[in-house]
């Protein structure tokens, strides 16, 4: 009798685990960002029109760099917008825009420290 209960529990656990992995693989950025920012920024999601999208999808659908605050075509665009200092292009060559990052080198961090008083 205990084996029947254990077998039923194992089947339920297996079903729940398979559903969890299917949903996780299908919709990586499926939440809304109305009141809080995207929780899936670690996997490359950003908020656009109160819905979280993949970053490369935002870049591919954009008509200009003004469509999203992190889109850029050069490092100067990132610096002008104040969203970073490095424009990284996507690996997909169909995307004509890149994504702004904050990249700080050791020399950039020490430039004010080494000034003579």
Swiss-Prot record:
The keyword Signal applies. It comes from the Eukaryota. Residues 56-117 form a propeptide. Contains 3 disulfide bonds. Keywords: Disulfide bond, Knottin, Plant defense, Signal. InterPro entries: Albumin_I_a, Cyclotide, Cyclotide_bracelet_CS, Cyclotide_sf. This is Cliotide T9.
